Structure formats: C-alpha cells, structure tokens
Amino acid sequence: MKAILYVIVAVIALILGGAAGVAGGYYWFERESRKKLNSAEARARHIVDEALREAEAKKKEAILEAKEEVHRLRTEAERELKERRAELQRLERRVLQKEEQLDRKVEQLERKEETLSRKERELDRKNQQAQELVNKQMAELERISQLTMEEARELFLKQVEQEARADAAKLIREIDAEARENAEKRARELVGLAVQRVAADHSSELTVTVVSLPNDEMKGRIIGREGRNIRTLETLTGVDLIIDDTPEAVVLSAFDPVRREVAKIALQKLIQDGRIHPARIEEMVEKAQKEVEARIREEGDAACFELGIHNLHPELVKLLGRLKFRTSYGQNVLKHSIEVAHLAGIMAAELGVNVEVAKRAGLLHDIGKAVDHEIEGSHVAIGVSLLRRYKEHPDVIHAMECHHGDVEPRSVEAHLVAAADAISAARPGARRETLETYIKRLEKLEALADSFDGVDKSYAIQAGREIRVMVKPEKIDDYAALKLTKEIARKIEEELEYPGQIRVVVVRETRAVEYAR
C-alpha cells in the first residue's frame, strides 16, 4: 500500500516538476524570444537608418552629378554657339567681301562700257571726218586735174593702197618683234629654270685607262714568258696593253669603254692575286665580265630610280647601263641622258604637258648609242627599233626620234626633248672639241654668210653661237635686211650641224659725210 502511495506521490511530484519545468522553459523561451525580437527590431531600425543615410548620400551625389552634367552641357552648348557665331561672322565677312568685289567689278564694267561708248562715238566722228575729207579731196582732185570721178577714185585707191601696205609692213615688223621678244623671254626663263635646277658634272672621258702597278717588276709578269700572258689578256678583252717606260703603270687602250673596264678590273684582280698565267687570266676576265654586267644593271636601275621612271623593260635598263661606258665628244652618254631627262621633265612641268613622256623620252633618246658599234645605222634609227621591239609608248618613240630633226615633231614633248638635248650638249664644259674642228666650224659659218649677195663682212662671235653680218647699204635696204636674216638662218639650218642655236644678226649702216670748209 505504501509502495503504491510512493508511486502516486512520485508521479504527482514528477507531474508537478514537469509542469514547473514547462512553465520555467516557457518563461525562458518567451524571454529569449523577446530579446531576439528586440535585437532584430534594433538591427532593422539600424539598417533602415543606414539605408536612409545611404539613400540621402546617393541622392545628393546624383543631384551633384546632374548639376555637373547640366554645367558641362551648358558649357558645350555655349562653346558651340560661340563657334557658330564666329563662323557666321566669317561667312558674313566673306559675303561682304564678295559684295564689295562684285560692286567693284560692276563699277569697272560700267567704266569700260562708258569708255567703249565714248570710243565708239569718237570713232563715228572720225569716220565722218574721214569721209568728209575723202569727199573734199576727191572734189579737189577732180577740180585740179580735171579727172573724172572714176579716174580720181582709182588714183585715190592706189594712194591708199600704198599707205596701207607701208602701215601693214610696219605693223608686221612690230608684231614680229614683240612675238620674238616674248617668245625669247619665256624660253630664256624656261631654260634658265631648267638649267639651274639640274646639277651636272663636267666631262673628261678618254679612250685610255691607266692601271697602277705596285712595282716595275710586275710589268714582266704581265707580259709573261714569250708574251703569252699579255697576248691572252688582249685576246680575251679586245684591249691593247701598252707597256712602256712609264714607271709603275700600264696603259689600256680601246675604243669600247666596256672592254676597257673589263680589262682594268681583270688586271687589277690579277695584280692583287699575284698569280698571272693564261688559265688565271681567263678566270679573272670572266669574273670581271660578270662584275661589269652587274654594274651595268645597277647603273641602269640607278638612273631609272633617280628619275622616278618605272616599268622600263629589263633589256632597256641594261642598255642604259651600257651608256655609262660610252662617251660623245668626251661627254658621258648616260649622264647626258639623265641630264636631258631632268631638263625635259622640268620644262614639261612648267608648260603643263606630259612630264612622264618627256622624262622617259629624254632618258632613252640616245639608247641606240649603246649598240651602234654592233648594228649598222644611225643611233636614232637603232633606238627607234629598240623602243618598238620592247613595246615603248608611241609618244615616247616619237619624241625620241625627233631629237636630231630627222622627223618633224608633232608634240610639245618632242620639241622639249630636242631642246633639252641641245642644252645639255651646249652647256659650258659638257663636251670637248679640238681647236682645229672648232676653227673650221667658225670659218664654215662665216663663209656661208659671205656667200649671200650684198654681204660686206661677217663675223662669228660668242664661240660660234652668233653670226654678225655687215651688209652694203646701197644694195640691201631695211626690208631686204629682214629677208636676208631669215635666208641666212634657213641656210645654216640646212647645211651646218651645230649644238643649240645660232643667232643671226644683220647690221645695215648708212653714213653721210660732208666737210665744212
């Protein structure tokens, strides 16, 4: 019984303890929940406050950025407005200037119109006076000579015709003199501009080359046993080796500069190598030929590069390089061709014609001289054949074939190439001429002028660039002097060969002498 009671008491105590525990747990849970709720509310308020502060800061920042953007846009708008105002002001000034120019032109036209009207009235008045004078003269003639109206008209017309012929001749002389003066002035300006823009070397090419030797013993080694070395070298190169008493030197003589250059290079290589025998000579000559061929190609390419000429056939480039080793009256032909191309190009640019055609024709105008010793014919005919073979432009071929006057020029470029060729050949120091040849040329020029009837004396001056002809005044009048000048110039062109141009001056002098006693 007691056990049951204890159990009941224990159960009751357990129930009461559980109830108390539940009540205590509930109280503790409620208190903790309240704490957490309060903490969460505090954090929420803090977050809200932070968000409000950040929103306020961002709002202020956005307002500030908006103000800055508005300021920037306003500044740009003001700058654009200022630029547009300035542009409008410039346009207004230009319009005002145009209006002023138009006003001035209108005033000029009005003045010209007034001048023309005045001149027209004056001309009408003079025509009327002339007609009145004619009528008066006709009446006077008829009265004095008792001529009929028809006879007086014929006499008057003859008189007017004579006066008109005299006036026409005078006018022709004045126009001719003015045209010549203007043409010569323009030509001098053009040639002077071209010449001063082209720097060219003076020429002093010879037909011999001197090779220096380290010592005179080398001469014997060059000659070789029984002369076999020198014979081999002469046979392979086609050059004459002159070994004389000149100390430490051997002279190479040949008409063909290419052969002379090959022999020079081969001999220099042999001297440097020291082994001189026929087999070695053949080897060195072959190397020298290849070296000269390469140099010829380089010279042709360099000439084209200097002038800015492109798409030239490789064979023509090679032939241009060969001109480096050709001379004409002592003038290097390649340098002469480059100079002619420069001069023709400059004059073509000044005249506004095709510069490319002028320069190309100037460079190629003497291309025939590269092979004229191998092919029969003049260098002009050979050059034309070469240019046609390698498909050069017809305008270039025409300008090239006209440079010696063999063909009548049909283009401005052809005239320019001929003029440039004459300028290059005639400039001081360009070409050498023996004294005997020079004197004969001047004597022939004077004899040609003396052959005309009425010529008293003639003098070739300015190194043959001018012929001054003194005529007999009783045989040659002023009109005949003008005609004689043209005839002498035409005969010089037909019978003489000369570089550049020759000025013909005819001088007629009349002297009246009387003595007072």
Swiss-Prot record:
GO cellular component, one term: plasma membrane
Keywords for the protein's UniProt record, in alphabetical order: Cell membrane, Endonuclease, Hydrolase, Membrane, Nuclease, RNA-binding, Transmembrane, Transmembrane helix
Record SMART domains: HDc (SM00471), KH (SM00322)
Bilayer-crossing regions: 3-23
EC number(s) per entry: 3.1.-.-
Compartments reported by the entry: Cell membrane
Cysteine disulfide links: none
Principal subcellular localization: membrane
Listed GO MF terms: RNA binding; RNA endonuclease activity
Domain HD: 333-426
Entry superkingdom: Bacteria
Pfam family, any one: KH_1
Xref: PROSITE patterns: HD, KH_TYPE_1
Leading EC class: hydrolase
Gene Ontology biological process: mRNA catabolic process
Domain (KH) ranges: 207-292
Family listed: Belongs to the RNase Y family.
Protein role: Endoribonuclease that initiates mRNA decay.
Alphabetized NCBIfam families for the sequence: HDIG, RNase_Y
Protein name: Ribonuclease Y
Source organism (scientific name): Symbiobacterium thermophilum (strain DSM 24528 / JCM 14929 / IAM 14863 / T)
Record gene name: rny
